[in-house]
Amino acid sequence: MGTRLKVLRVFKDLHRTRRDVFRDDNRALTAARVKINEEFKKNKNETSDDNIKEMLKMARAVETILRESVIQAEHVDENKIVLRPRKSLLLENVPYCDAPSKKT
């Protein structure tokens, strides 16, 4: 696959992830869109294959972090926050046990 297609694919993947991660949060959606577009425009004239590969690697890492680590939270009261995790984050969730297990 050509470099141009790889860049376009990463660009689209970042925007898809942005839409999924920040669903129903217009402020975060807009800020993420602006930042993604700004970074890609800033580097659109890059010609070095090594630099492009490094930037693609970084963009993939950012996309992975957004997809796997970011969770939405909303203040609903002075001392209350509602978390809205995506289903993909809960698949590998293991309940925390506060009591240590006894060894026999």
Swiss-Prot record:
Location relative to the cell: Mitochondrion matrix
Domain of life the protein comes from: Eukaryota
Any one cellular-component term (Gene Ontology): mitochondrial matrix
Molecular-function GO term, any one: protein folding chaperone
One BP term from GO: mitochondrial respiratory chain complex III assembly
Keyword Cell membrane: no
Pfam annotation, one family: Complex1_LYR
Keywords associated with the record: Chaperone, Mitochondrion
InterPro entries in the record: Complex1_LYR_dom (IPR008011), Complex1_LYR_LYRM7 (IPR045298), MZM1/LYRM7 (IPR050435)
Subunit and partners: Interacts with UQCRFS1.
Job description of the protein: Assembly factor required for Rieske Fe-S protein UQCRFS1 incorporation into the cytochrome b-c1 (CIII) complex. Functions as a chaperone, binding to this subunit within the mitochondrial matrix and stabilizing it prior to its translocation and insertion into the late CIII dimeric intermediate within the mitochondrial inner membrane.
Family per record: Belongs to the complex I LYR family.
Protein's name according to its UniProt entry: Complex III assembly factor LYRM7
Organism from which the protein derives: Danio rerio
Taxonomic lineage: Eukaryota, Metazoa, Chordata, Craniata, Vertebrata
